[in-house]
Curated annotation (Swiss-Prot):
GO terms for biological process: DNA recombination; double-strand break repair via nonhomologous end joining; telomere maintenance. Pfam families: Ku, Ku_C, Ku_N, Ku_PK_bind. One of its GO terms (molecular function) is ATP hydrolysis activity. InterPro entries: Ku70/Ku80_beta-barrel_dom (IPR006164), Ku80 (IPR024193), Ku_C (IPR005160), Ku_C_sf (IPR036494), Ku_N (IPR005161), Ku_PK_bind (IPR014893), SPOC-like_C_dom_sf (IPR016194), vWFA_dom_sf (IPR036465). It comes from Oryza sativa subsp. japonica (Rice). It is found in: Nucleus. It catalyses: ATP + H2O = ADP + phosphate + H(+). The keyword Acyltransferase does not apply. Keywords: ATP-binding, DNA damage, DNA recombination, DNA repair, DNA-binding, Helicase, Hydrolase, Nucleotide-binding, Nucleus. Signal peptide: none annotated. It is an enzyme of class 3 (hydrolase). Interacts with KU70. This is ATP-dependent DNA helicase 2 subunit KU80. Residues 222-430 form the Ku domain.
Length: 688
């Protein structure tokens, strides 16, 4: 077998006690096939059903026994027929014997591959509730030993998923079956997990088998004279959507070996000589540095790069409490002792247990590869194993440097006035809401465990991809019931706690929140805190008055616009927060002043001054988010003075770019950019 190729046999219990969950079993197995069609198209899958009414397997034909076990699909390369074999699973009528199913699956793998080494795996899904038949010789435990020895000899692994809904009472038969499966775990490479809901079942089966690859093999250097041989793997890594690629449909449909690949090639040409292609050795990257572009060649850039030596060094120890959880970055790594190195195993175990007892963590400096351009600084946390055949290890999380940290200071709730803090009744209602939606209530299993919770977006994508391959015009189906339990609160809990939710809505009265005006720069400079806003509106502080006077020295009493410096008077009015309508008052005063200037103009000598005031008004209306006030005023001016034949004023209005405020300048405006551009070009009304 190829190194990355896997042979998998699914052992599915379809007995009467599993009927309620077979739909979810079909879904998870189908998702497994969908992912293999995307990532591992050369993998092979076989399907064995047990608990069926019929019997159909090679061992039953040759040796007898192994009843109610059916080979639904021989081990073949994964294809669409595999998905069909996993749809509409038969509802069996007999209790399932999982030991018989394991023997049949093991026999299929040995017949198919013999002594050929490769990745071979069996996956058992059962509730293990029914008694198993007694073997012809020895005990059931002896039978498990025999099967486990064969699995070890042929390097065959097994995953066991035991599904039992919460509330099912354990009996002697279940305990015996669980012990037999745990014995598999002790004697061979077997993983046993218990799930109690269809949603957990979706995440229990590894639908994509990712080959573990070390990111580092070498010494964990505690000191110059104390080094431990370790291997480092990735513990977690984000599973992303398959990469969308360009494919061509030009190849004939009959050509099975067509790659349908689209190759893209880029050519760089000179601006001065558009027909000349610039070769790679004449191209160079540039970096913006202020207004200029600084060219840096690849050779220069390599010389600038930091090139530390490969290695992992321990810098020191610190209390676990001194490293905040929110500082962890990127992926999680697992440090394990070098396989087969007993001294490394003992050293890692001793160090991990000492750190655990003292509640300490270690700070490491890591350079995974020679020539790596960056250094990782991180925290090493001990992971003490509770299983007999699993070694102690460490988890490693990368920590941020000073440049990576984003500090956002927020005010404490305790500093808010009493009117902004919740009442005792409101706090009690909020506490009850948190308790109601607790995913790990006392006395119950945790809901939505990360190990058993699949990504609903990925699950839905693969199902839709399969549907689209069969029905090109198919619409996106509604979200599956099991996936809804991941993305939405449990509807049973919501219905049961309806009175509590209603009470929560009653104690928090909803009020309309009016749109706030955007604070100007000078206002931000004088802002002293939310607690003092009311006081500031009534009595401006000396500091605020000083800053305002420095920015906008008042020429006369605020509230009046004089003839000497009308623009500065208007700006002074805007800085004077004497009431809640201070902006509106200033705008209205400036509108009156501009209208009076134009009306009282002799030989149009005030037009220039009026336009300067109009430009200032336009700028203020954009800043204070009052575009409609300005647009309405300018429209009235044009309607009033266009019939009077004042074309010079309208021409000046256009030349000074004091036309209407468009949506591009202020989102609240009702005027498009084209309307604003053509506003002053409207034809005069006919005199007829």
């Amino acid at each position: 077998m190829a190194r990355n190729k896997e042979a998998l046999v699914l052992l599915l219990d379809v007995g009467p006690s599993m009927h309620g969950v077979l739909q979810e079993v079909e879904n998870i197995c189908s998702t497994l096939v969908h992912k293999k069609l995307v990532y591992n198209r050369s993998d092979e899958i076989g399907v064995v059903l047990f608990g069926t009414k019929e019997t159909s397997n090679e061992l039953a034909k040759e040796l007898g026994g192994y009843k109610h076990v059916v080979v639904a699909r021989d081990i073949k390369v994964v294809d669409e027929e595999t998905t069909n074999a996993l749809q509409n699973l038969p509802r069996g009528t007999s209790p399932g014997d999982f030991l018989d199913a394991i023997v049949v699956g093991l026999d299929m793998l040995i017949r198919k591959f013999g002594n050929i080494k490769g990745k071979q795996r069996m996956c058992l899904v059962t509730d293990a509730q029914h008694p198993l038949r007694d073997p012809p010789q020895g005990t059931k435990k002896d039978q498990v030993d025999t099967i486990a020895d064969q699995m070890k000899r042929h390097e065959i692994k097994m995953d066991c998923i035991i599904f039992r809904e919460s509330g099912v009472r354990h009996n002697a038969v279940m305990d015996e079956n669980d012990q037999l499966l745990y014995h598999f775990r002790e004697r061979s490479v077997t993983k046993v997990v218990h799930v109690d809901s269809p949603t957990s079942l979706l995440g229990a089966l590894r639908t994509r088998n990712v080959l573990p690859v070390t990111v580092f093999r070498g010494d964990l250097e505690v000191s110059s004279s104390f080094k431990i041989k370790v291997w480092v793997y990735k513990k977690t890594s984000e599973e992303k959507f398959p990469t969308l690629k360009k494919y061509s449909d030009k190849a004939p449909a009959s050509d099975k070996f067509a790659s349908h690949e689209v190759k893209v090639d880029y050519e760089y040409k000179s601006v001065l000589e558009p027909d000349t292609v610039v070769p790679p050795d004449q191209r160079i990257k540039g970096y913006l540095y202020g207004p200029q572009v600084v060219p840096i060649s690849s050779a220069e850039w390599e010389a600038v790069k930091f090139k530390p030596e490969k290695g992992v060094k321990l810098l020191g120890f610190t209390d676990r409490s001194s490293i905040s959880r929110h500082y962890f970055m990127k992926d999680v790594f697992s440090f394990v002792p070098e396989p087969g190195n007993t001294k490394a195993v003992a050293a890692v175990s001793a160090l991990a247990r000492a750190m655990s007892e003292m509640n300490k963590v270690a700070i490491l400096r890591c350079v995974w590869r020679q020539g790596q351009g960056n250094v990782a600084l991180g925290v090493l946390t001990p992971n003490i194993s509770s299983a007999k055949n699993v070694l102690d290890s460490f988890y490693f999380n990368i920590l941020p440097f000073a440049e990576d940290i984003r500090e956002f200071q927020f005010r404490s709730f305790s500093s808010l006035p009493s009117s902004s803090q919740p009442t005792k009744e409101q706090q009690e209602a909020a506490d009850n809401l948190v308790k109601m939606l607790d995913l790990a209530p006392p006395g119950r299993e945790e809901i939505l465990k990360p190990d058993f919770t699949p990504n609903p977006m990925l699950e839905r994508f693969y199902r839709y991809l399969d549907l689209k391959s069969k029905q090109p015009d198919a619409n996106v189906p509604p979200l599956d019931k099991c996936l809804k339990k991941i993305t939405e609160p449990d509807p049973d809990v919501i219905d049961y706690q309806a009175p509590l939710i209603k009470k929560l809505g009653n104690v928090f009265e909803l009020k309309e929140n009016p749109k706030k005006k955007k604070a100007r720069t000078q206002d931000r400079l004088t802002y002293t805190g939310a607690d003092d806003q009311a006081k500031l509106l009534e009595e401006p502080s000396a500091e605020k008055v000083g800053v305002s006077e420095a920015l906008y020295p008042p020429k006369k009493k605020a509230g009046e616009i004089g003839d000497h410096n009308p623009v500065q008077d208007f700006e002074a009015m805007l800085t004077q927060r004497s009431s809640s309508t201070w902006v509106q008052t200033a705008i209205e005063e400036m509108q009156k002043y501009i209208t009076a200037l134009i009306q009282d103009s002799c030989d149009r000598d005030n037009h220039q001054k009026a336009l300067e005031c109009l430009v200032a008004l336009r700028k203020a209306c954009i800043i204070e988010q009052e575009p409609n006030e300005y647009n309405g005023f300018v429209t009235k001016l044009c309607q009033k003075f266009r019939p009077a034949g004042d074309k010079i004023f309208l021409q000046l209005l256009s030349s000074k770019k004091a036309s209407l405020i468009s949506k591009e300048e202020a989102p609240d405006s009702d005027v498009t950019e084209e309307m604003a551009r053509n506003f002053c070009l409207k034809p005069e009304p006919s005199s007829q």
